[in-house]
C-alpha cells in the first residue's frame, strides 16, 4: 500500500515539476516576445515638416550641427547629422530660397530633354541618311550616359539613404522622409527615354535600310503614347504652377501665389521639406519673430 502511495506522490511531483518547467518556458517566450516588440520601438522620432509661412522659406534647412538647439542633447552624432543634411540636400540646393522655381525649371528641362527624339522625328526636312546617323549617334551616346546615371540615382537615393535610415533605426531613432515621389519621378522619365529612343532608332533604320524586322505602325503608336505622357505631364505641371494666368517665375515673390503653390505641391507631389523636429523626448517650436528654435519644457504648466 505504501508503495502505491509513494508511486502516486512521485507522479504528482513529476507533474508539478513539468508544469513549472512549462511555465518557466512560457515566461521566457513572453519575455523574448516583449523584448522583440520593444526592439522596434523608437525612443526618438524626427520628422521633416512642411513650410506654411512664406517668410520662413530660407529656414527649410536647419542649422549646422554646432548651432543646432541643445545639439539634440547628443542624440545624433556630427556624422549622422551631416548624413541627414545630405539627404535633404539631394532634393534641393540648400541656397535656393524658392524651391518652387527650382522644381519647375527642373521639370521643364526634363520634359524638353525627353521629347528631343520626337522633335527630331518630326523634323523631316533633313536627308534621311543624316537623320539616321545623327539620331543613332545621339541615342547611343545619351543611352550610355543615362544607364550608369540610373544606377547611380538608385544607389544614391534608395540604397544610401535607406542605409542612413536603418542605421538610425538601430539606435532607436526614426527618420520620416517624404520626398521619394519627387526623386522617383526623374527615375521614371529616364526609364521612358530608353524605350523611346530604341523605337525611334528602329524607325530610322526602317526608313533608311528598309528592313522588315518589326512592325512600323505598332512602334509608332507606342512612341506616340510615350510622347503623349510627356506632353500631358508638361501641361499638368504648367497648370499646377499657374495662378490667375500669372506664371510662377514672373510673380514668384507674391506671397499669396507662393502659399497656394506650396499647398498644391504638398497635395500632389510632396517634394518639399522645411525643418527637422524631434518628438517624444525633445520638443522644439520655431519663433517666427527671430527664426530660432527653442526647447519646450513639457513639465512647465504654462506650456
UniProtKB/Swiss-Prot annotation:
Keywords: Membrane, Transmembrane, Transmembrane helix. PANTHER family: GATA ZINC FINGER DOMAIN-CONTAINING PROTEIN 4-RELATED (PTHR36911:SF3), LIM ZINC-BINDING DOMAIN-CONTAINING PROTEIN-RELATED (PTHR36911). The chain crosses the membrane at residues 102-122, 132-152, 184-204, 221-241. Its main location: membrane. One of its GO terms (cellular component) is membrane. It comes from the Eukaryota. This is Putative uncharacterized transmembrane protein DDB_G0285385. It is a multi-pass membrane protein. It is found in: Membrane.
Amino acid at each position: 500500500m505504501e508503495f502505491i502511495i509513494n508511486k502516486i506522490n512521485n507522479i504528482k511531483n513529476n507533474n508539478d515539476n513539468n508544469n513549472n518547467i512549462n511555465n518557466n518556458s512560457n515566461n521566457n517566450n513572453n519575455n523574448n516576445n516583449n523584448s522583440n516588440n520593444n526592439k522596434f520601438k523608437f525612443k526618438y522620432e524626427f520628422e521633416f515638416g512642411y513650410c506654411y509661412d512664406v517668410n520662413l522659406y530660407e529656414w527649410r534647412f536647419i542649422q549646422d550641427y554646432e548651432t543646432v538647439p541643445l545639439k539634440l542633447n547628443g542624440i545624433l552624432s556630427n556624422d549622422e547629422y551631416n548624413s541627414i543634411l545630405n539627404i535633404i540636400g539631394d532634393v534641393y540646393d540648400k541656397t535656393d530660397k524658392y524651391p518652387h522655381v527650382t522644381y519647375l525649371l527642373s521639370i521643364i528641362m526634363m520634359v524638353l530633354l525627353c521629347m528631343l527624339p520626337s522633335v527630331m522625328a518630326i523634323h523631316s526636312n533633313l536627308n534621311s541618311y543624316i537623320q539616321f546617323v545623327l539620331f543613332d549617334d545621339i541615342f547611343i551616346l545619351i543611352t550610355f550616359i543615362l544607364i550608369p546615371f540610373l544606377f547611380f540615382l538608385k544607389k544614391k537615393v534608395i540604397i544610401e539613404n535607406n542605409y542612413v535610415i536603418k542605421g538610425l533605426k538601430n539606435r532607436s531613432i526614426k527618420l520620416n522622409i517624404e520626398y521619394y515621389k519627387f526623386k522617383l519621378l526623374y527615375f521614371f522619365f529616364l526609364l521612358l527615354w530608353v524605350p523611346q529612343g530604341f523605337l525611334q532608332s528602329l524607325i530610322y533604320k526602317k526608313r533608311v535600310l528598309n528592313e522588315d524586322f518589326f512592325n512600323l505602325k505598332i512602334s509608332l503608336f507606342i512612341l506616340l503614347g510615350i510622347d503623349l505622357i510627356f506632353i500631358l505631364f508638361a501641361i499638368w505641371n504648367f497648370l499646377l504652377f499657374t495662378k490667375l494666368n500669372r506664371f510662377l517665375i514672373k510673380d514668384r515673390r507674391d506671397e499669396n501665389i507662393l502659399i497656394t503653390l506650396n499647398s498644391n505641391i504638398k497635395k500632389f507631389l510632396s517634394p518639399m521639406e522645411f525643418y527637422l523636429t524631434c518628438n517624444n523626448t525633445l520638443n522644439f517650436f520655431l519663433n517666427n519673430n527671430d527664426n530660432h528654435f527653442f526647447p519646450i519644457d513639457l513639465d512647465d504648466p504654462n506650456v
